[in-house]
Design a protein with these regions (language model features):
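N-terminal secretory signal peptides
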Residues: 1-9, 13-28
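Extracytoplasmic/periplasmic ligand-capture domains
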Residues: 2-9, 31, 87, 113-145, ...
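Bacterial lipoprotein signal-peptidase II cleavage site
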Residues: 30-41
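Short, well-ordered beta-strand elements
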Residues: 47-56, 107-110, 269, 282, ...
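N-terminal lobe/hinge region of extracytoplasmic solute-binding protein
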Residues: 53-103, 266
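Surface-exposed intrinsically disordered loops and tails
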Residues: 146-212, 365-391, 435
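Gly/Pro-rich hinge or "lid" segments in bacterial periplasmic/extracellular proteins
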Residues: 180-212, 220-221, 226-302, 310
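Structural transition elements
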Residues: 417-435
Length: 435
């Protein structure tokens, strides 16, 4: 049974520049934003800059391999996706201006707009082409780079799973890996890998070239993906980092050092990475080359490292040194009762990118399905009585009516908690019609 129940909410203290950040939707991760509203306080921002603290150092800026929110910042703000969602959850054009689906061949075709890559100085390097998506996907599928999100590709793109697995086995053979269960890997002169597991017949894997993977640059502005099956959520997947483009020559030049600094990162999004110094600062500047630059209203986003951001942030807000900080419950009352700070405090925007919910265990007994098995519950948990209870509608309703959402949310959101209530699994902005 899952026990998560409430959504994380925070109280933010913000200076004037935060309003622009909210309107522009800049601080994004996983297609979402997190920013406080602004009113009344002195701020370091001039209306064109936005400064915040960070206290957790990202392990990488490589958007093609990471899977954590903090490390997605560069990919979310500095690299555009083929399609994107607007603030109402409606899918819009991104780097692709149109797309078509061929059900007979399970192929999506995307037509790209004119766009450019820029370096850390904002200078144009080269145009964005369909080949950049192909090269980026090959990078994700290269085991040496250990992409944490490779499963978002291998599960859906034709040939990707075979390509990735073969190269994992090949690496194992070349490095003499022996699995914990005794499985060994060998490779012959023709590149055929043999995997030998205990008590099993050896399995052989012929070489798989990347040409077998279902991604193709038809020309500079036409890109196709061929799927393993008709997956209705594929367009949504394109908003995730492993489907973002990367400049091929830069990937080839930098290898595992790609996106480890501003100099090894090229951008084609709303911002470009202008500077990055580990444990010091992180600066993104507006990209004037971006097709949607007219709708980006902040020129510079600066992140300053401060190991005690949660402690120092509120005081730095008062001094006008930064534009946003988290206000803890230990000082919230004093801020709200002080005429000089009360108007600086506002609730964070509700995050409707995900939900938490209870899921009951309806299978307390062991059972063998065609493709998986359930071990069942230990006798001490009385599986027979469990089954009787869990299949009783009134028993399940007791959980529904026994949870007081308001009381739970009020712990972290003492003011305005009603805005964060959610009584459905599907977030309200999950989908929308033309209206």
């Amino acid at each position: 049974m899952n026990t998560s129940i409430s959504r994380r909410q925070f109280l933010k203290a913000s200076g004037l520049a935060a309003a622009g950040a909210c309107a522009a939707g800049l601080l994004t991760g996983c297609a979402g934003s997190s920013s406080g509203s602004a009113s009344g306080a002195a701020s370091s921002g001039s209306g064109s800059s936005y400064t915040i603290l960070y206290d957790s150092q990202p392990a990488t800026l490589n958007y093609l391999t990471t899977g954590t929110d903090l490390e997605m910042v560069v990919g979310a703000n500095c690299v555009d996706t083929l399609v994107e969602y607007d603030n109402k959850g409606v899918m819009r054009e991104g780097l692709a201006t149109s797309w078509d689906w061929d059900a007979d061949t399970l192929t999506w075709t995307f037509h790209l707009r004119e766009e450019n890559w820029v370096d850390c100085n904002g200078e144009v390097v080269a145009p964005v082409t369909a080949q950049d998506f192909v090269d980026a996907l090959k990078y994700v599928l290269t085991p040496d780079y250990a992409a944490s999100n490779v499963g978002l590709v291998t599960a859906y793109i034709a040939g990707a799973d075979d390509y990735y697995n073969y190269h994992v086995y090949l690496n194992n053979a070349n490095t003499g890996v022996v699995d914990d269960d005794g499985t060994t890997y060998t490779v012959d002169g023709s590149g055929v890998v043999t995997v030998t597991a205990p008590d099993s017949d050896p399995a052989t894997y012929a070489p798989v070239d990347f040409d077998a993977v279902g991604v193709t640059a038809v020309d500079d502005h036409t890109l196709t993906y061929t799927l393993t099956y008709d997956f209705p959520g594929f367009l949504s997947l394109l908003c995730y980092l492993p489907y973002e483009p990367a400049y091929g020559p830069l990937l080839e030049e930098t290898g595992d050092q790609f996106a480890t600094s501003a100099e090894t990162t090229y951008s084609c999004g709303a911002f470009y990475l202008a500077a990055y110094e580990s444990l010091e600062t992180w600066v993104m500047k507006k990209n004037p080359e971006n097709y949607d630059a007219d709708n980006v209203f902040i020129d510079t986003i600066s992140r300053i490292y401060n190991a005690e951001a949660s402690v120092n942030g509120p005081e730095m807000i008062k001094r006008g040194e930064i534009d946003e900080a988290t206000i803890g419950s230990d000082i919230l009352d004093s801020w709200l009762s002080d005429d000089t700070t009360k108007d600086m405090v506002s609730m964070d925007r509700p995050n409707t990118n995900y939900t938490y919910f209870y899921m009951f265990n309806f299978m307390p007994f062991s059972h063998e399905f065609s493709n998986w098995s359930v071990e069942g519950m230990d006798a001490e948990y009385e599986p027979e009585n469990w089954a009787k209870a869990i299949n009783n509608t009134n028993f399940r309703k007791s959980f529904l009516y026994g949870i007081n959402n308001s009381v739970t949310l009020a712990v972290k959101a003492p003011e305005g908690y009603d805005n964060y209530k959610l009584n459905t699994i599907t977030p309200p902005s999950f989908c929308a019609n033309a209206d």
